[in-house]
Curated annotation (Swiss-Prot):
GO terms for molecular function: structural constituent of ribosome. InterPro entries: Ribosomal_uL29 (IPR001854), Ribosomal_uL29_CS (IPR018254), Ribosomal_uL29_sf (IPR036049). GO terms for biological process: translation. It comes from the Archaea. The keyword Ribosomal protein applies. This is Large ribosomal subunit protein uL29. One of its GO terms (cellular component) is ribosome. Pfam families: Ribosomal_L29. The keyword Ribosomal protein applies. Keywords: Ribonucleoprotein, Ribosomal protein. SUPFAM superfamilies: Ribosomal protein L29 (L29p). It comes from Pyrococcus abyssi (strain GE5 / Orsay). Belongs to the universal ribosomal protein uL29 family.
Amino acid sequence: MKPSEIREMSIEEIDAKIRELRLQLAKERGMLTMGTSLENPMVIRNLRRDIARLLTIKREKLREMRKK
């Protein structure tokens, strides 16, 4: 996800996307633990980065709201 896409989302939408990505990350890690080879090993890394991006922008939005 691009930061510009995330900034257009509301905080509720960001929270929903974070939950969705965390669930997907748990599934991917579970597959890895069970010994299943992943189609794309970069999936886990990309999921972690997307979650971090979402959390960062969410925090920025919350700070802006508190200042107002």
